[in-house]
Structures are given as structure tokens and as C-alpha cells.
Curated annotation (Swiss-Prot):
Protein name: Adenosine deaminase
Record-listed pentostatin binding positions: 14-16, 141, 170, 200, 221, 278
GO CC list: cytosol
One BP term from GO: adenosine catabolic process
Source lineage: Bacteria, Pseudomonadati, Pseudomonadota, Gammaproteobacteria, Enterobacterales
Organism in which the protein naturally occurs: Salmonella typhimurium (strain LT2 / SGSC1412 / ATCC 700720)
Signal peptide: none
Substrates-to-products reaction catalysed: adenosine + H2O + H(+) = inosine + NH4(+); 2'-deoxyadenosine + H2O + H(+) = 2'-deoxyinosine + NH4(+)
Cofactor list: Zn(2+)
Amino acid sequence: MIDITLPLTDIHRHLDGNIRAQTILDLGRQFNIALPAQTLETLIPHVQVTSTEPDLVSFLTKLDWGVKVLASLDACRRVAFENIEDAARNGLHYVELRFSPGYMAMAHQLPIAGVVEAVIDGVRDGCNTFGVEARLIGIMSRTFGEAACLQELDALLAHRENITALDLAGDELGFPGSLFLSHFNRARDAGWHITVHAGEAAGPESIWQAIRELGAERIGHGVKAVEDRALMDFLAQQRIGIESCLTSNIQTSTVASLADHPLKTFLEHGVLASLNTDDPAVQGVDIIHEYHVAAPAAGLSREQIRQAQINGLEIAFLSDSEKRALREKVAEA
């Protein structure tokens, strides 16, 4: 179902949600950190979703073991590098990796700005090694509150030339976007793009707020947009993209089943929706699974899957010339 004549992208992919189980095991041993299991086989149920979680917050607890072993900046650098290696193995030509430096720093009180620098270094080395093109999106973890998000923002702005966009993720219901208006004003002043997790746990009003108040150019997940036809019209007319993550939305119980997922409706409505993974290591999936298994199960036709692939590059945070160069590179391969 993947069109090999087109660039394959993943523009909603959490770097700190894609820490390999083997790496968790390795780092746990290296830093003498107690893990819930001592072999790869027995560790996987603790760090990977093996059945549907009751809600988003329950799903997010699966991520915690990955960051609990980040006891040094070198460990952060390693997982960033491995993220690019994984992208290359999946056949991705372009990936946007998003990460919350405060979340990665938290368990071992690492310097947040140091985490940002380590991630930048690891991704740069990975791109040079594996030939994948990547951009970084900084996340503010809303669950930690406004002050903690300000610390994350300051650390990201210290490396602003290496960061492409700002995102807001975490507990959407408990920490609405209205708490972070000044944060996003600073991000836009820095020339960054804006994407926001919205309409995943909260309703369409959260998406409207992300667009009108935070300046979102893309929406992460955005499944609740299907409940508001005027919103879908607006998204299509204004070319505001939706970063769809099919398997993730089932695993978090955001959507009951793939057959119920609104991605097909979005595409029929002319919304620029794309296919993405979200947290591949935690979910136990890759981008190939999303195209070959999840998308058909969600009712997408072959042409709709191709359109979602086209949309992935169309709404990527790249210039028109960069998109054109990527298309030409793939066409000539």
C-alpha cells in the first residue's frame, strides 16, 4: 500500500516514545537501575502495549520506563541516534521527531538544555550515518504545569536554530491550551512552526482553541474534529493538517476500533490528514504496519492511502524547495 515512487514520511513520532526495549534493558544494567524484568521477553509487557489501555493517561505510563533509564546525556544521545536508525530501517525518507526535554530529564535531574543538545547531536549523527532527513519538534509536557513548560521552552529556545516547531502534549483535559498562550507567542516570535495535540481526549473546542489561540498549523490526532462539520470545513479550507495515528488511537481507547476511526472521513472531506506512528516502540508497530494493516482496516481505499502519503509531505514542516528536492530524490532512486 506504500507508493514507492513517493517520499514516505512520519511527522507525528515521539522520540521519547520510541526507546527500544533492548536499550531500556542495556541502560538499566549500565546504570544499575531496577527494572520490572531482567530479560527482553519479560520486559516487553511492561514497556509495550499488549492490549488496549482504558485511557490516554494509562497508555502514557508505558512510556515511563524508557525515560527512567536516561541517567546521562550520552543515554539521551543514544536513543536519539537509534530513532534515526529505526526510521531508516522502516524505509522513511523524512521524519519529524518530537520530544519533551523536561520529561526526558526528570528521572535523573539531567540539565534540560543538555538533553536538548544531546538529542540534537544524536539525531544529526544518525542522519549523517543513515541518510534519513529529519527535523526536531520540541514538546512542552502540559501535565507538568505552566512553570515546567516554561523551563522546557527556555531550553529549546537556547537551541532554536535546530528546532523546527513547538508542540503541546500530555493531559489535554486537565491542562487546556489556554494556560500556554504566552509560551506559544514566544515560539511564533522565534519563527517556529506550531503543532498541537488536540481533539484526542478533549472535544472539537480544543482543536478550535489550538488554532485560534495557539496558532496551530497542524493538529496532532484531532479525532474529535469529526464531531464538528464546520471545523472540518475550516481545516480543509485553511489547509491545516491532521497528524493521524491509527493504532495509537485504538490503544488509548480514543477510538473504539479502526473501523470507527475518522481518518477516512477526513480524507473524504478534503482535510490534509496523514498516516503516522506516534510511539512506535511502546505500541509495537511501525509505519509499514500503519499503511499495510491499520489503514485498510480503517476502511481506506488504495487511493486514499496514497493521498494520505502525499499529505504527509504536503503538511511537513519543510520549505517548498525542500519538498521538491525530496520528491526528486525519491523519484530518481
